[in-house]
């Protein structure tokens, strides 16, 4: 019974296998760097192709980029506020586009065609190191935003409306990056595993609904991450009316 189960296709699925690059005493996840470079290359190609010949009446890729710009500008303005959103629009937009292409790339790019000595390529956002790094970057960004706009007055936030709130707001600073990173990582990894298992069990047509659902949830996760990042920055720069 046990040997027969081990021979099933889904028994070949491996989780947590990595291609390591050793630099000094550091072990880096090589496949995450490789897939991230592919994503960055795709984004650069998209931007170059859409801005190479700008037209007054936008078409094709230029039209898509202008639509994305308008959408992200409104998102940043709504979450951060009129006074500060322009400074942070490039950051929020870059987060959204990178996560969006990472998530969709995990479902649409045939990563398995590239053979590695160990592990396999996939969405960079399905690796906890990637999502934690981005979440910590968001935390540093809203600290910087608050301090650069308010100076030391930023720390008044921790004792308002009463000093009793100090420990809770310190804990909040730790839970924000945790929730950002694990939400994105968990959703993208779960999508990839569900599609992989279905593709092994029933390779024809059956995985397609799960793939389409994964594309939808991947887009939503990119939007949630970017919106929360903008919201945290907006909270840091917000001036209370007196």
From Swiss-Prot:
Pfam entry (one): ATP-synt_A
Keyword Magnesium attributed: no
Family statement: Belongs to the ATPase A chain family.
Membrane topology: Multi-pass membrane protein
Organism whose genome encodes this protein: Synechococcus sp. (strain WH7803)
UniProt-listed PANTHER family: ATP SYNTHASE SUBUNIT A, CHLOROPLASTIC
Protein name according to UniProt: ATP synthase subunit a
Keywords of the record: ATP synthesis, CF(0), Hydrogen ion transport, Ion transport, Membrane, Thylakoid, Transmembrane, Transmembrane helix, Transport
GO molecular-function terms, A-Z: proton-transporting ATP synthase activity, rotational mechanism
Transmembrane segments: 28-48, 89-109, 128-148, 193-213, 214-234
Subunit structure: F-type ATPases have 2 components, CF(1) - the catalytic core - and CF(0) - the membrane proton channel. CF(1) has five subunits: alpha(3), beta(3), gamma(1), delta(1), epsilon(1). CF(0) has four main subunits: a, b, b' and c.
Known role: Key component of the proton channel; it plays a direct role in the translocation of protons across the membrane.
Subcellular location: Cellular thylakoid membrane
GO cellular component terms listed in the entry, alphabetical order: plasma membrane-derived thylakoid membrane; proton-transporting ATP synthase complex
